[in-house]
């Protein structure tokens, strides 16, 4: 078992990954750890507030490094202003780590088999599929036959008070231009 056994090879991989990939691994991990708590991600202002850090060059460089290395994506939630850009964690290993390994107190080599039909694993599969789509928008557009069309990628959700909500995980908004 590569994740859940006592000496599993990937048990400490999360920390090693950040230490080897980034100059300031603890700072970067704090951002990723926060983004791992909410599938829709957070705005820049929300990240700064929740982590109680200042806006500046270190934060900006950290976001750029995470974007460039495909750990996160930046998107504009449908129906909101351009100022409400969200940053969303899409790295598959990091998402898996946050859902299943981060708070794991014990080792259980049969974890996956014993939890295969659990609600937690079912929810994670949905999030994982959504993130695969978000990470491969160009391939999705090609499969849909719209690879040459200018688009914007977004997500949308609506949750009225005291009611169940509605959510669309991936919107591909087409920009069609007419020339006169």
Q: For the regions a protein language model found, what residue spans apply to each?
A:
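Active-site beta-strand-loop-beta-strand hairpin of nuclease catalytic cores
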Residues: 172-180
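Accessory nucleic acid-recognition modules appended to NTPase machines
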Residues: 2-170
């Amino acid at each position: 078992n590569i994740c859940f056994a006592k000496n599993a090879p990937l048990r400490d991989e999360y920390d090693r990954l950040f230490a080897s990939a980034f100059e300031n691994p603890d700072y970067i991990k704090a951002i990723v750890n926060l983004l791992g708590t909410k599938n829709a991600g957070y705005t820049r202002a929300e990240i700064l507030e929740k982590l109680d850090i200042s806006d500046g060059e270190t934060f900006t460089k950290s976001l750029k490094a995470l974007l460039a290395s495909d750990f996160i994506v930046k998107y504009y939630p449908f129906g909101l202003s351009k100022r409400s850009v969200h940053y969303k964690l899409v790295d598959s290993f990091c998402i898996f780590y946050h859902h299943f390994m981060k708070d794991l107190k014990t080792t259980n080599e049969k974890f996956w088999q014993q939890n295969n039909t659990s609600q937690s694993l079912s929810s994670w599969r949905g999030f994982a599929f959504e993130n695969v789509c978000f990470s491969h928008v160009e391939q999705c557009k090609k499969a849909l036959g719209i690879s040459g069309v200018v688009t914007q990628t977004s997500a949308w959700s609506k949750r009225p008070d005291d009611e169940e909500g509605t959510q669309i995980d991936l919107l591909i908004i087409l920009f069609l231009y007419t020339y006169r």
